[in-house]
Amino acid sequence: MLAIGITGSYASGKTFILDYLAEKGYKTFCADRCIKELYQDLKIQTGILKLLPELETFNIGKISNLIYNNDLAREKLQNFIYPLLIEKLIQFKQENVNSKFGFAEIPLLYEAKFDKYFDFVVTVHCSEEIRMQRATTRSSFDVEIYNKIKEIQLSQESKIAKADFAINSGVDMLDLEKQINNLIANLECRV
């Protein structure tokens, strides 16, 4: 199986493209969804509360606020949760070893050095205006957190430069499908 990492800035369209690929029958893995599942585990909640006692109670909103305003807390949480995420990613790859392609959306792929787990990386990108417009439609939108996320992520330009492929999601659906089909055709040549 070719393992393809999908990354990009906040609200760039990564999940939309991952879900589109899943609808087309490709095997997919979403880091954000996986982490949300991990957070349901009481042992993991307890571990996070021991690691970050200032939280007092396990609350996703509190965690977000803390990690985007406290570099040390973010680093502690990442050091705790990333090995668990890597286990789940490796399990996904093993379970789908006979598939031609496996696509995994990892928002902080380069920042967390997850690129080593992939044969190819795709960066999904669009203009800042479109990203902000998309972000504001989310129920959890907070402009301060949006700006903090931008600060800790590599720039969109850096992610595009590092990637093997780039998809501009700031286009109409027909053009987006064409780009995804071109990506698949390119990957087919590399199997």
UniProtKB/Swiss-Prot annotation:
Catalysed reactions listed for this entry: 3'-dephospho-CoA + ATP = ADP + CoA + H(+)
Protein origin, superkingdom: Bacteria
GO cellular component: cytoplasm
Pfam families: CoaE
GO BP term, example: coenzyme A biosynthetic process
SUPFAM superfamilies documented for this protein: P-loop containing nucleoside triphosphate hydrolases (SSF52540)
Enzyme class: transferase
InterPro entries for the chain: Depp_CoAkinase, P-loop_NTPase
Similarity remark: Belongs to the CoaE family.
Described function: Catalyzes the phosphorylation of the 3'-hydroxyl group of dephosphocoenzyme A to form coenzyme A.
Protein name as it appears in the record: Dephospho-CoA kinase
Organism encoding this protein: Rickettsia bellii (strain RML369-C)
